[in-house]
């Protein structure tokens, strides 16, 4: 058993927190002690303790889009957060820290480095976040999920949930399927409106040639159901939230969704063709996440202005079952199913 200590620094969104939890659990099973560094007002504050991991808090928030007053106060806020993080590091003395992104990683990584603790970074997105960009200069090891975020970093993929990794391969799952094309439309919390507005119109154009399962997000169920009914397509399944996403992937022939880092990695691991609609962000992060799957012939990217019912219906109508199977196999070939083990191995190597 290891007995070594890891501090995971991650917060703000599920895209940072869930991969961190996967690596933490993997190392805890090998006897590591793990603690978490986060902020008290973001999702990690509730989520991490539910996973049996103690969490320490520092006070820090993002600087993007803040007024001049906030920017002038930033150096003092960062210094105070660094001081809090340094006190936590000195008290617990981890053998290594793992930065998975979010504002907390900045002061946390600097504090670890100033204490002589090795800093390991993992970038989940196809374009590096601001915090990871400057922490990379002091890190012992930098890893990336997709090629291109850093010029020389090792590509290790994103840790993906075990129930998704356990799905049968596309050749097993999709062979012998017939009937309407099963389309899984995943509107999440971030900008699901465009999918919710467009997919009923797609259904109207394709009729009985597709079977839709549409996750619409919180509070949108009645409105979207009414839209399907209005175009005489009420036979489709509309859910506010899908709890068992692995089962939904297993059911689907093709997925229509945003291209957040974890979604793209899950779609690849599941082995599914995709139509990706990147969230419109100024650094085009989601576009770069989806690009490797499009380049592999496993997906099509529609920027939001091009994501029209006519375009999506034409694309889906052009994919027969042999095409869908070939695309599914290409998606699975791009996946890195042992990402959790790869990240954990680098953490072990870097530990002092």
From Swiss-Prot:
Gene Ontology biological process terms from the UniProt entry: carbohydrate metabolic process; cell division; cell wall organization; lipid glycosylation; peptidoglycan biosynthetic process; regulation of cell shape
Membrane topology: Peripheral membrane protein
Role this protein plays: Cell wall formation. Catalyzes the transfer of a GlcNAc subunit on undecaprenyl-pyrophosphoryl-MurNAc-pentapeptide (lipid intermediate I) to form undecaprenyl-pyrophosphoryl-MurNAc-(pentapeptide)GlcNAc (lipid intermediate II).
Subcellular location: Cell inner membrane
Pfam family, one: Glyco_transf_28
Residues that bind UDP-N-acetyl-alpha-D-glucosamine: 13-15, 125, 161, 189, 242, 261-266, 286
Superkingdom, taxonomy of origin: Bacteria
GO terms for cellular component: plasma membrane
Reactions the enzyme catalyzes: di-trans,octa-cis-undecaprenyl diphospho-N-acetyl-alpha-D-muramoyl-L-alanyl-D-glutamyl-meso-2,6-diaminopimeloyl-D-alanyl-D-alanine + UDP-N-acetyl-alpha-D-glucosamine = di-trans,octa-cis-undecaprenyl diphospho-[N-acetyl-alpha-D-glucosaminyl-(1->4)]-N-acetyl-alpha-D-muramoyl-L-alanyl-D-glutamyl-meso-2,6-diaminopimeloyl-D-alanyl-D-alanine + UDP + H(+)
Descriptive protein name: UDP-N-acetylglucosamine--N-acetylmuramyl-(pentapeptide) pyrophosphoryl-undecaprenol N-acetylglucosamine transferase
Keyword Cell division carried by entry: yes
Gene this chain is encoded by: murG
Family annotation (PANTHER family): GLYCOSYLTRANSFERASE, UDP-N-ACETYLGLUCOSAMINE--N-ACETYLMURAMYL-(PENTAPEPTIDE) PYROPHOSPHORYL-UNDECAPRENOL N-ACETYLGLUCOSAMINE TRANSFERASE 1
EC number, UniProt record: 2.4.1.227
Record GO terms (molecular function): UDP-N-acetyl-D-glucosamine:N-acetylmuramoyl-L-alanyl-D-glutamyl-meso-2,6-diaminopimelyl-D-alanyl-D-alanine-diphosphoundecaprenol 4-beta-N-acetylglucosaminlytransferase activity; undecaprenyldiphospho-muramoylpentapeptide beta-N-acetylglucosaminyltransferase activity
HAMAP family, A to Z: MurG
Pathway where it operates: Cell wall biogenesis; peptidoglycan biosynthesis
Catalytic EC class: transferase
Keyword field: Cell cycle, Cell division, Cell inner membrane, Cell membrane, Cell shape, Cell wall biogenesis/degradation, Glycosyltransferase, Membrane, Peptidoglycan synthesis, Transferase
Family assignment from sequence similarity: Belongs to the glycosyltransferase 28 family. MurG subfamily.
Main location as per UniProt: membrane
